[in-house]
Amino acid sequence: MWRDVAHGPMLWCWWGCDALAVMAVQAIRRMRGGAQSQLMLGADGNLWVVKFQNNPQHLRVLANELIVTRIAEAVGLTVPKSDVIEVSEWLVGNSPEMWVDQVRGAKARCAHGLQFGSQFVGGMMPGQVVDYLPESQMAEVRNLAEFAGMLVVDKWTGNCNGRQAVFERKARERRYRAIFIDQGFCFNAGGWDFPDAPLRGVFPRNHVYATVRGWQSFEPWLSRVENFAASKLGEIAEEVPPAWYGGDTRVLEQMMETLLQRRSRVRELVGQFRDSSRRPFPEWGKTALRPVPGHADWLGEAGKMVM
């Protein structure tokens, strides 16, 4: 069980024998969104967006967040650092803003104990973070190709929500970087099943998929998902505190087994989106132009490109 491993003020908590949780030390403000998360300062000095066990969406969204963020990290996608956050009963009781709105105008205190935390994008460093970029600026996103990779993960894990991302630009940098957030509605939120549909788990605007020309555009992420090791998935599942799924290990194991079986269906699921009426990949099947190294400048831009 979780226990204090520090002397004096509690800074860290311990789960089982090999997982540490970050202690929350201050509530900063409430965040936008249906989960009613809180921005909190951790004992590690970082800002964390914390989702609580009694959030209005479902208890299991905490498990979903941790599992899918870990999967995305493992296949090489850009996601915020995530961790288990310990929120003390004292902190909740002494932070007037730590409430969760419930039905019919009722309110409840945010749950204390083990919560899910995602590091606040941008942190305390100067820079710029936006949740929308016009199409004209999308070409300046450094990792735009990762939207295809995140689509693979969303289809594999049955994300029943639209894909969400924020765009971060560091101070004195010109280009943005996409960071994929909010994995809570993977595995159909609290359902822990997979009611697949072509337009689920996709970004709302097609231009993030402008570089997709075929299956090669989904690499290396597609191959990494199709070959995702069962042992690695088991390690990820073991990180999830049992309180986040009601302690029913059997249900978690069944969901992980289904996820392993779905690896072979990812191309089919992406193909259903490709063939949908939305036509998300207008460049599919076209060959990208590529520069010819070493050609003289007098050739001009057109002369430097080949099919």
Language-model features and meaning:
Residues 2, 12-15:
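Tryptophan (W) side chains
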Residues 4-7, 18:
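Acidic/polar hotspots within intrinsically disordered regions
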Residues 17-131, 153-160, 176, 183-187, ...:
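Conserved ATP-binding subdomain of kinase catalytic cores across diverse folds
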Residues 53, 170-307:
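C-terminal catalytic region of ATP-dependent kinase domains
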Residues 61, 142-146, 248:
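Aromatic-acidic/polar surface patches that form glycan- and anion
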Residues 64, 68, 148, 255:
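Catalytic-loop motifs flanking and including active-site residues across diverse enzymes
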Residues 129-154, 170-173:
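An alpha-helical support segment within catalytic cores of ATP-dependent transferases
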Residues 160-169:
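A short glycine-rich, hydrophobically flanked beta-strand micro-motif that places a catalytic Asp/Glu
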